[in-house]
């Protein structure tokens, strides 16, 4: 049985097309006409990936994404009929991993689904040869626990945020360009735009600060980012 995918879209024709396309590639798909039905099903049996239309009656896709992200780090792809900067930023800020504007080719969605699930498998299948622990300041990344800690407190990161922060912790004082981070975390074949790096790092910066860390994500204007530890007084 293939990976389980939940799909919510109030447009029946789109829902049936995507359901058929994903199922033909070997995925186990359940489709829903609204976000509330998907949430109810997820509470009973979580899926491995979720695809959400933003504009739906009842609980919209952004609210569903926010609810799912509060309890799970599974990959989430948002669909929207509007090519809007605000929709894009809102979607990423709610914790989605990727974004597609309608109309789109089903093959593009399939490519994104494969890439996200492949990265989940890679995260789970880290070898013993990999670096088990990385430290910078009061932050510690544990490959065994697949988590970042500030002291003894776990920093509540999604899998995408975890991949990005752990990548930067390998060389914490290096200046990383947006393009390098984008390629390292989302891959060279990704159609995700560079601004998703900015939004993901904004969330990481906020979560690290909330955990009480002395480490911050510093912006290098016109280039990218680096980690910086506050000077001790």
Task: Annotate each language-model stretch with its function.
Residues 4, 115-175, 179, 228:
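Short, Lys/Arg-enriched segments at the junction into DNA-binding effector domains
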Residues 11-30:
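Two-component/phosphorelay signaling modules centered on CheY-like receiver
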Residues 31-49:
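Acidic, metal-coordinating helix/loop segments flanking the phosphotransfer/catalytic sites
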Residues 33-34, 60-63, 87:
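Acidic catalytic/metal-coordinating carboxylates
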Residues 46-48, 71-75, 191:
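His-Asp phosphorelay/catalytic-motif detector in bacterial-type signaling
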Residues 54-55, 82:
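The short loop immediately C-terminal to the conserved phospho-acceptor aspartate in CheY-like receiver
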Residues 66, 70, 75-135:
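Basic, amphipathic DNA-recognition helix from helix-turn-helix-like DNA-binding domains
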Residues 147, 152-215, 221-223:
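Positively charged, aromatic-enriched patches within helix-turn-helix-type DNA-binding elements
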